[in-house]
């Protein structure tokens, strides 16, 4: 089953949440949030664009780095960067923040 835009957006939102917990640069956090919003509302399926070789970084708000991450998600079903963030933040803290 191909990865849907909504799933990619969800991953980018989680990355933004975890970066926020870590106190990362606000511009970086905003880039992930804006990309998630753009992807969520984007009319074309990103996996189809990748399959046909269309460049993702031509989408407003999606730079080369985020385009590579989208390709990784579509091709592998997950994002190594997200796994790294999850491993650095205690699950209990994530759970606590999800409740509030």
Where are these regions (language model features)?
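Structure-specific DNA junction-binding interface
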Residues: 1-97
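Short, positively charged, Gly/Tyr-enriched micro-motifs
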Residues: 100
